[in-house]
Structure formats: C-alpha cells, structure tokens
C-alpha cells in the first residue's frame, strides 16, 4: 500500500494457469520511501477460492486518484511470475511497477516500485518488498 498523497494502491487479480491456495495468508512488507526504510509490517489476508484462482486479478493494482487519470494496468504472466505496470498522468504523475513470483502454491515474493512526480519533480520514490505465505484456513 502506498503512503502519503499518492493514490491508494490496493493489492487486488484474471490469470491463466497461475493459482495459489485459498486460505489465511501472512503478508510481510518492508518499504523504503525516499531513502528511509520502514519496519516490516505484517498483515493477515483471507483469500477465497475465487481470489486464489485468479491471481492476475487479485494482485493487480487498483488506483484511486484525484486530478490524475490512470491508464489500465498492463500485465503479463509468464510461468509463475506476474508483472504489471500502472501509469497515471495529471496533477500527480505516477509510475508503478509490480513483480510477483509465486514460487509455490503457498508462498510468493514481490517487489512494487512507485515513483511520483509533480511538475516533473520527483516527490516520492517508494520500493516495497513483500512476502506472502499461507498459514492456514481462514477463520
């Protein structure tokens, strides 16, 4: 999730053969924003069978911007890797790249890189490393 005045990015997925296990997932993220590293954040996420079976949709970016227009995200799935690219133009120009490696049906790693510019000036440079692991059934 991006912080500050950047649009809200919700990790949210239409995939081909790529699927993961439904259930309760522990998602750990570490963010470096403008050179400052945050402490790891750990969150739980319950994935339904529908969400787990449609990884490209579940993990695609969804943006909400004010005074900026976003193009539909371009995405590509190769083997067990999902990559996407989102661009928004307007008062805030945003360029976001995501790469998710689903190394097993119960584990993935990802990197999301975001650069935000206003009037051509870089105002936000964010890199988030993510690890997700299935920890059980949803409660």
Model region roles, listed by residue range:
Residues 58-99:
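Mid-chain, structured segments of secreted extracytoplasmic proteins
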Residues 40-41, 92-98, 112, 124-128:
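Short, surface-exposed coil-to-beta transition loops
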